[in-house]
Design a protein with these regions (language model features):
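Ser/Thr/Gly-rich flexible loops in soluble cytosolic domains mediating phosphotransfer, phosphorylation
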Residues: 2-3, 7-23, 34-46, 64, ...
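Periplasmic-binding protein-like
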Residues: 5-6, 56-62, 102-103, 145-152
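PAS/PAS-like sensory domain cap-loop motif
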Residues: 225-236
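Non-catalytic positions within long, well-ordered alpha-helices that form the structural scaffold/packing
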Residues: 51-52, 138-141
């Protein structure tokens, strides 16, 4: 069973609980990690410890949480962003588009023109900085707006001013995010299985095999090569190829210009 965590607001938490109740992903053990209302408040150590403790394989999260977490973790992160599908699913809930503001982060732009044409409406879009959302909502209220479409932070300030709040992430968006994260995990598992099979073949071959990167730094040496060269793994890995092969052989490899070569050397 694969393990996936969703990081986000209480809205995401509600979606995760609904998805778990509906048993939409029976092959996945789902976890929810709260971001405490804002990326600045997220408990990084708690997230890192939970990933290790639960052996979580991938995370689904929004763009602000991604900025904080992605540089610190080694598992795949799938970013969800509001899309046309989310705005379409909101359509029947919005009371008055003329008095409803779409509050967006300047980090990403969404083209709503096709929906405007199909639904015969006009979205009133406003962009904010992370520190300026509170002042923007206050100004929108003063300008006569009665509703806000936005993220959890925008809705928190909108509700304080008695405005209607419409969360622009739908449950379908989170479902798609989980499904995509699951596909990433499966692809990685298949790739790891393939690498394991190739490594097993290389380890059992009677020919010595050495892999290098483009800088001729050794990245892999099979058992036969170690036996031929009379060396240990730690003594050659990440070392220049010149440390174990004569320069004339390396020159021939470089002149060949290909990724493969039939050049062989006999043990001395």
């Amino acid at each position: 069973m694969q393990k996936i965590a969703v990081v986000g607001s209480s809205y995401f938490e509600k979606y995760v609980e609904q998805i778990k109740t509906a048993d939409m992903f029976p092959q996945v053990e789902l976890f929810f990690i709260p971001d405490n209302g804002a990326p600045a408040n997220i408990d990084i150590n708690f997230v890192l410890n939970l990933i290790e403790e639960k052996a979580i394989q991938a995370i689904v999260l929004g763009p602000f949480d991604y900025e904080r977490l992605a540089p610190l973790i080694s598992i795949p992160c799938y970013i969800v962003l509001p899309n046309l599908q989310d705005f379409l699913l909101l359509h029947n809930r919005v009371k008055d588009y003329k008095k409803t503001a779409v509050v967006l982060s300047p980090q990403y732009e969404i083209d709503l023109s096709s929906l405007e044409q199909c639904l015969h409406i006009k979205y009133n879009r406003f962009f904010y900085s992370q520190d300026g959302v509170k002042d923007l909502i206050r100004q929108l209220k003063a300008d006569g707006y009665t509703g806000v479409i936005g993220n959890s932070t925008s809705l928190m300030h909108a509700e304080k001013h008695g405005m209607d709040g419409y969360y622009y992430f739908s449950r379908k968006c989170i479902e798609d995010g989980i499904n995509n994260a699951l596909q990433i995990i499966r692809n990685m598992e298949r790739e790891n299985q393939y690498v394991s099979e190739v490594r097993s073949l290389l380890e059992s071959t009677t020919c010595g095999v050495i892999y290098t990167d483009s800088n001729m730094t050794i990245t892999y040496v099979n058992k036969t090569a170690f036996d031929i060269l009379h060396c240990y793994r730690d003594s050659v890995l990440q070392k220049p190829l010149t440390d174990i092969l004569p320069s004339k052989i390396i020159e021939r490899l470089q002149r060949s210009g290909g990724q493969e070569s039939n050049i062989r050397t006999n043990p001395v």
